[in-house]
A protein has these predicted regions:
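Long beta-sheet-rich domains in secretory-pathway and surface-associated proteins
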Residues: 173-238
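Short solvent-exposed strand-capping/beta-turn motif centered on an Asx-Ser/Thr pair
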Residues: 75-77, 87-89, 166, 199, ...
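C-terminal edge strands of extracellular/lumenal beta-sandwich accessory domains
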Residues: 10-16, 68, 100-107, 114-117, ...
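Secreted peptidase-domain scaffold signal
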Residues: 37-109, 178-189
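Hydrolase catalytic cores
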Residues: 1-28
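Surface-exposed beta-strand/loop patches in noncatalytic accessory domains
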Residues: 103-143, 231
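Acidic glycine-/aspartate-rich tracts in secreted/extracellular proteins
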Residues: 23-26, 87-89, 119-120, 168, ...
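Short proline/glycine- and polar residue-rich coil/turn motifs
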Residues: 62, 138-143, 152-154, 200, ...
Length: 238
């Protein structure tokens, strides 16, 4: 990840990649015995290197009363899977007054992910309160800080992924990590530099990794430049 993006991933990104790319074990989906499955480091690495082409890995921020929408194109040859993971704020401590496996919600900032296609909404996995039962994909998950939506047989078409939240976000915002696999794209741009603050007479150089499949031409254009600013592009920077 450091070699590709020039930065170290957050803990939530590492956790999200590990859960997202794990090989399923035990019951279908997450379960109390195997969790998200068996770690697959090769698939996690391939998800990082394919970022922007057949996968998406990013670190995002959600503000109070905000929702964020991503429109992606599924390859149609493998499941479309989208996951969000976040490091939640500390909740109320369990001082031993709760029974084992007590279902009382401990989540502080409750984020949500949905995938939509036309009028159909796809929900994330949710563990059943009965530990021996399989996880379900038919209702909201208000318990976990890892949410994953999986469409086993998507079509080669566009799907809308929406990230939102319920209730009040403590501190007014919540960082989260997004991982998506099962995508197709003809090119990608992955930033490798941070935000810059410069004076009006200075140049700002933003670097990125540009990847392209096929022989088509990609045209870049700047949007929202300050008055008097001029932008130029090459294969590695703006």
């Amino acid at each position: 990840y450091k070699n590709v993006t020039n930065s170290f991933m957050k803990a939530a990104t590492l956790k999200g990649l590990a859960c997202h790319t794990a090989d399923d074990a035990g019951n279908i989906g997450p379960d109390p015995i195997f969790g998200w499955g068996l770690l697959n480091a090769k698939k996690a690495a391939e998800t990082i290197t394919g970022n922007g082409l057949n996968s998406w890995v990013s670190e995002e921020n959600l503000n109070q009363e905000q929702s964020t929408t991503f429109v992606v194109k599924a390859s149609g040859t493998e499941p479309l899977i989208a996951s969000i993971t976040w490091t939640d704020l500390p909740g109320a401590a369990n001082n031993g007054n709760l029974a084992a496996n007590d279902p009382t919600k401990a989540l502080v900032n409750d984020l949500d992910i949905r995938i939509r296609k036309n009028a159909v909404s796809y929900f994330p996995w949710k563990l059943n309160s009965n530990a021996s039962s399989e996880a379900i994909q038919s209702e909201d998950n208000a318990i976990d800080n890892v949410e994953q939506v999986k469409i086993d047989s998507p079509t080669n078409s566009e799907y809308t992924i929406t990230i939102s939240h319920k209730g009040l976000l403590q501190t007014g915002k919540q960082n989260y990590s997004l991982v998506i696999t099962g995508l197709t794209s003809s090119f990608s741009i992955v930033p490798t530099s941070s935000d810059l603050t410069v004076c009006s007479n200075q140049n700002a150089v933003f670097t990125y990794n540009y990847k392209q499949t096929g022989t088509g031409t990609t045209t870049f254009s700047p949007v929202g430049l300050p008055v008097g600013a001029i932008a130029s592009f090459n294969n590695t920077s703006l």
